[in-house]
Amino acid sequence: MSKRITKTSAIHDKHSIITRDTESGFEYDSDSESDVENVFPNIRVQRIRDKLYQDEDEDEDEQVDDEDEEDEEDKEDEEDDADNFENENEEEVDDYIDGDGMRNFDMGESIEVGDVDSTSERKNGKIKKLTSRQLQKEQKRIKRTGVCYLSRIPPYMKPATLRSILSRFGKIDRLFLKPEDSAIYHKRVKYGGNKKKNFTEGWVEFVNKKDAKMCASTLNANKLGGRKTSYYYDDVINMKYLSGFKWFDLTQQIAKENEVRQAKLSLELSQQQKLNKTFVNNVEKSKLVSTIQRKRKERDPEHESDSHIRRSFKQRKVTSTRADADEELKARAQPDRKLSDVLSKVF
C-alpha cells in the first residue's frame, strides 16, 4: 500500500528538499522521491526528459569545446610550421622525392604500384621540398633496405599470396612481378588452358636487408611448405639476394627499357611513313604518265608506238671474289692497276 503524500511545511532541515508538483500542486519531501514517482508518474517522465535534455546540452558543450581545442591546435601547428620555414637556415634540396610509382608493384592487382613517399608532405595540392635533414633520413631508410630477385614464381600465384608468404621473414615494402607474354597467355586460353594470370619473374624489397638475406637463404630452391592441403605446398621458388642493389636501380632499368622500346617504335613508324610516302608518289606518277599517254593517243593515233615512254636505269656491274665465280666477275673485282702502282710508290 503506497503511502499518502501530504502537504509539508516549508520548514525542513538541510538534508531534505521541498519539491512541488506543478500539475497537482502538492509539495513533497525529496527523501520520498520513489513513492512520489509511483503515485505521480508524470513527475518521473518530466525528470527523465529534463535529464535527457541536460545530457544533450552537456554533450553539445563538450563537442564545441573539443572543436575549439582542435582549431586552436591546428592554428598553433600552422604557426609553428611557418616559423620553422622562416627560421630554417639550412640549404633546401631542390630535388623531389620521386613518388612510389612502383610501390607495391603487384602486377596482378593493377600494379599497386602509386603512392607518394611518406617523407614528402602535401600542402595545397603541391609536394613540399625536403630539407637536408629529411633527405638524410630518407637516405638512411633506403640504405637499410634489401632487394631480392625471384627467377621463378610458382604457377598462377597471386601477388597477395606471395606477399603473405614472404612477410613471415620481415616487413615488405614493395613487390614487382612481371607478367607473362600476352601471346603465350592468349594461346593457352585459346586451347582451353588455365585463364589465371601467370608471372615469370619478380623483385621484392624488404625494409631490413637482414630479413632479405634470411628469406633468400631459406626459401631458395626449397619447398614453400605450410599446410599440406595448400595449393603451393610442393612448389619451389628461386630467390637471390642482390647485394648493393636498390629499388631505384630497378626503376631506372625499366625506364631505360621503355625508352629503348619507344625509340624502336618511333624508328619503325618513320620508316613506314617513308614507304607510304614513296608509294603515294609512285601512284601519282603512274596516273600522270597514263594521262599523258591517253592525250597523245587522242591527238595522234598513228604514232601510238612512239607514245610509249622509255625509262633508263643505271645498272651496276656484278663482281665477286668467290673461288667458283666466273673469271669475268673476278677480273672486275680486282683493284685498278694504276691505283695500285701509285699506292706502291707512296708507301
Curated annotation (Swiss-Prot):
This is Pre-rRNA-processing protein ESF2. Residues 310-319 have a biased composition (Basic residues). InterPro entries: ABT1/Esf2, ABT1/ESF2_RRM, Nucleotide-bd_a/b_plait_sf, RBD_domain_sf. Belongs to the ESF2/ABP1 family. One of its GO terms (molecular function) is RNA binding. One of its GO terms (cellular component) is nucleolus. The gene is ESF2. The keyword tRNA processing does not apply. Its main location: nucleus. One of its GO terms (biological process) is endonucleolytic cleavage to generate mature 5'-end of SSU-rRNA from (SSU-rRNA, 5.8S rRNA, LSU-rRNA). Residues 146-236 form the RRM domain. Involved in the small subunit (SSU) processome assembly and function, and in the 18S rRNA synthesis. Required for the early cleavages at sites A0, A1 and A2. Residues 1-101, 290-347 are annotated as: Disordered. Disulfide bonds: none annotated. Keywords: Nucleus, Ribosome biogenesis, RNA-binding, rRNA processing. It comes from Scheffersomyces stipitis (strain ATCC 58785 / CBS 6054 / NBRC 10063 / NRRL Y-11545). It is found in: Nucleus, Nucleolus. It comes from the Eukaryota. Residues 10-23, 298-309, 328-340 have a biased composition (Basic and acidic residues). Residues 24-36, 55-98 have a biased composition (Acidic residues).
